[in-house]
Amino acid sequence: MLGLAIYAERTENVAARDAARRAAEVFLSRNLFLGRHSGRVMNKEFVLLHYPLYYSYDVLGGLKAMAEIGRIRDPRCRKALDLLESKRLPAGGWPAEQRLYRVSSGVEARTDSVDWGGTSKTTPNEWVTADALHVLKAAGRA
């Protein structure tokens, strides 16, 4: 979706623009994290904040994508934005609630040689916080 949207913007390619819009509709029709018919959380991982996401998905990643393609103010982002705001820590900032990698000096699947700030339910992660503030500002909520 992001690649198609950027390509369409730079080349004015109508087919790519339409494909990006259709892809956005898949996410928006599910409020970025809810089952379209059940209204329940599709996957518990979607409502946890991670950094970095790599090839995975969470609600903040979905919101970032909507901000980048200019769809963050779509009313169907409201529940995801509310969820994000609810995760703000009392002292400010947002936590990385779960890690998708382990720090390692060797080459293994799902490892990284960088520590991206760790995970904690009570301590803000600077990367997650920067992304959350960017999204909320783009949505007119900051």
Label every model-predicted segment.
Residues 1-79, 95-142:
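An alpha-helical repeat/solenoid feature that recognizes helix-turn-helix modules
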Residues 84-85:
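TPR/TPR-like (Sel1-like) alpha-helical repeat modules
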